[in-house]
Design a protein with these regions (language model features):
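Basic-flanked hydrophobic alpha-helices used for secretion and membrane insertion
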Residues: 1-263
Length: 263
């Protein structure tokens, strides 16, 4: 009594692996090695894989929405900011990966339309406490005209007075949001073989190439819309668009089928 004893969870884990073998480590964790499930709610693996997601409408231009390229002309993208004012007021990331075990987050939210994702190509929309979404998210979803955003960015670059939309605070039905779709491509498919020089060339700056690639890409669609449950003091997900770890796994396995990898 009065003593707290040590549980050698990490010691036993490393002793059972014995080397820098990540596959063995994952197998150990997945098989409840050291009874680790008694001490954690979930084990979530993060991989350096970013889904390449585009607007399905390529009529006027090819618009990448993840990672977002809207502000690349200003010298920053989804991971950095050009000025502190923007950094303090917005994030250019609207897509995020959620935990695989949705039972950990489901009690915090009401499903107001559809359902939580059950397939790798499904995305859930997470609203704010009062049922809203940011205008930046609406541009990414194509519910606001992205040309408006392009115009404001260009005016900022040119140090011109910025003309903002006059129809702010728009509302959208759940059906309008549920009808949103995206296109996803594999990053390995950005490369095409050049037989003249016997090399693979990055074609991501070739508009016609990218338009064809996006048009033939995989479709991602909205499976549901969720909103923080009334009375919930803390939630696991910030407002945005969330895909499951199954999508990441799909992307990891995908390059094995591409020509650049097979060659």
């Amino acid at each position: 009594d009065g003593d707290v004893h040590e549980i050698q969870m990490l010691t036993n884990m490393f002793a059972s692996i014995g080397s820098n073998d990540l596959a063995a480590l994952k197998e150990y964790l997945d098989s409840n090695g050291g009874n680790i499930n008694d001490y954690v709610n979930a084990i979530h693996y993060l991989y350096n894989v970013t889904p390449q997601i585009f607007s399905p409408d390529t009529t006027d231009k090819v618009r990448q929405v993840n990672p977002d390229t809207t502000f690349s002309a200003l010298g920053f993208g989804s991971g950095a900011s050009a000025n502190s004012l923007m950094a303090a007021n917005m994030s250019t990331n609207v897509f995020n990966e959620m935990v695989g075990d949705t039972s950990l987050v489901e009690p915090q939210y009401d499903v107001v339309a559809g359902h939580w994702p059950t397939s790798y190509n499904e995305i859930v929309v997470v609203l704010t406490d009062n049922g809203g979404v940011s205008d930046f998210m609406l541009y990414a979803m194509g519910l606001r005209d992205p040309a408006e955003l392009d115009s404001m960015v260009q005016q900022l670059i040119n140090d011109e007075p910025i003309v903002t939309p006059t129809d702010g605070n728009k509302t959208f039905s759940y059906d309008e949001i549920m009808n949103v779709a995206f296109k996803m491509v594999n990053a390995a498919d950005y490369y095409a073989f050049d037989p003249t020089y016997n090399v693979w060339t990055d074609k991501s700056s070739d508009t016609d190439f990218m338009r064809n690639l996006v048009n033939s890409g995989e479709e991602l669609h909205i499976s549901g819309i969720v909103q923080p449950r009334s009375g919930t003091t803390a939630t696991a997900l910030t407002p945005g668009l969330y895909y499951t770890p199954d999508l990441t796994t799909h992307l990891i396995n995908g390059p094995a089928q591409t020509q650049i990898v097979q060659k």
